[in-house]
Design a protein with these regions (language model features):
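Residue-level detector of alpha-helix boundaries and kinks
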Residues: 1, 26, 41, 77, ...
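Short amphipathic alpha-helical segments, especially helix-boundary/capping motifs
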Residues: 1-2, 14-18, 29-33, 72-77, ...
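Alpha-helical bundle segments that constitute or directly flank the non-heme di-iron/ferroxidase center
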Residues: 1-24, 47-58, 130-133
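Amphipathic, soluble alpha-helical interaction motifs
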Residues: 14, 18-21, 25, 55, ...
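Short, contiguous alpha-helical
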Residues: 28-71, 111-143
Length: 143
C-alpha cells in the first residue's frame, strides 16, 4: 500500500517543473472548444484535490458520506482558462502536499473500515494518485 505514497511523492516533486517546461501558448490552447486545455486539466486536478480532501476528512467522522462534483461545471465556473498559470500551479502544489500529509496519517488507520461514496478510503487514495498520473500524462503529451 505504501507504494502509491511513494508514487505520489514523486509526482508532487516532478510535476511543477514538468508543467513549467510547457510553452504558455500550448498550455492554454484548446484542441476544440468543447475540450479542456492543459491549463483547464490542471484546474480539474485542483477540483479533484479539493473534493477528495473533503472526502478523506469527512469519511473519518461520518458514515459513508456521498461527495460528488460535476467536473465540467466546476472547471467552467472556476474560470481556470483565464487564471494565472503560476497561481494554479501554486494552489495545486499546496493542496497535494496537504493530501500527501493526510494520506501518510490515514495509512496508520484502518482504511478498509471507513468509506466514502461506497468505496474504501484505501481504494480512494490509490485511485486519486492514479487519476492524477492519468491527467499528468495527458498534459505532458505532445498536442
Amino acid at each position: 500500500m505504501d507504494n502509491f505514497i511513494q508514487d505520489f511523492e514523486v509526482l508532487i516533486a516532478a510535476f511543477p517543473s514538468e508543467l513549467s517546461a510547457i510553452d504558455t501558448i500550448a498550455f492554454s490552447a484548446k484542441p476544440v472548444p468543447e475540450r479542456w486545455s492543459k491549463k483547464e486539466i490542471l484546474g480539474h486536478l485542483i477540483d479533484s484535490a479539493m473534493t477528495n480532501y473533503l472526502r478523506f476528512i469527512r469519511a473519518q467522522s461520518e458514515e459513508n458520506p456521498q461527495i460528488f462534483y460535476t467536473q465540467d461545471d466546476f472547471c467552467e465556473n472556476a474560470n481556470y482558462q483565464q487564471s494565472e498559470t503560476k497561481q494554479l500551479l501554486d494552489l495545486w502544489l499546496a493542496l497535494n502536499k496537504q493530501l500527501l500529509f493526510l494520506f501518510k496519517t490515514l495509512i496508520t488507520k484502518s482504511l478498509t473500515m471507513r468509506k466514502c461514496n461506497d468505496l474504501t478510503l484505501a481504494f480512494l487514495m490509490e485511485d486519486y494518485v492514479a487519476h492524477l498520473n492519468h491527467h499528468r500524462q495527458q498534459i505532458l503529451a505532445k498536442s
